[in-house]
Amino acid sequence: MSWSKVKYFFFDTPEEKEAAQYSYEKEQTDMKKQQDPPEQQDVTFPKAQTKQNVVSIETAKQSSKVVLLEPRTYSEAQGIADHLKGRRAVVINLQRMSTDQAVRIVDFLSGTVYAIGGDIQKIGPKTFMCTPENVDIVGAISELFGEEEDTNIKRW
């Protein structure tokens, strides 16, 4: 207990009570003034910061690679699919493979390209280009070369 409280308890006089009441009323008035807002205030809100769309040049360079491959067996199809998953375009030359294995690779890569939202196009005899969704193929060159018709496989 502080000395002022003890003093007030034992030696309380009417003048001191009146002074205490006056200071209490003054504190209450000051608090009301602080709580009452002025009638009109100009309130300005900070502008919302918009997020800028900035693409690093490094990122653009990384996503625009073309990989040239010449697989010899069907087991290399998964490696080709990994390039596509890495957002790289792939040109595949299947001329050194048997026709049966080449058809299997094209079927596998067609499914892979479909799954990633890309595209596959024939660009030459037994040559295909597979692209992920970030690469667009424009134009067609199939009419420019004389393709040998393979009578055994009608799909190609």
UniProtKB/Swiss-Prot annotation:
InterPro entries assigned to the protein according to its UniProt record, in alphabetical order: Cell_div_SepF (IPR023052), Cell_div_SepF/SepF-rel (IPR007561), SepF-like_sf (IPR038594)
Primary location class: cytoplasm
Region (Disordered): 23-48
Extent of Polar residues compositional bias: 37-48
Biased composition (Basic and acidic residues): 23-36
Compartments in which it is found: Cytoplasm
Keywords: Cell cycle, Cell division, Cytoplasm, Septation
Any single biological process term in GO: division septum assembly
A cellular-component GO term for this protein: cytoplasm
Keyword set includes Cell cycle: yes
Gene3D superfamilies: SepF-like protein
Pfam families: SepF (PF04472)
PANTHER family, A to Z: CELL DIVISION PROTEIN SEPF
General function of this protein: Cell division protein that is part of the divisome complex and is recruited early to the Z-ring. Probably stimulates Z-ring formation, perhaps through the cross-linking of FtsZ protofilaments. Its function overlaps with FtsA.
Protein family membership: Belongs to the SepF family.
Subunit structure: Homodimer. Interacts with FtsZ.
Protein's UniProt name: Cell division protein SepF
Species in which this protein is naturally found: Bacillus cereus (strain AH187)
Lineage, top ranks: Bacteria, Bacillati, Bacillota, Bacilli, Bacillales
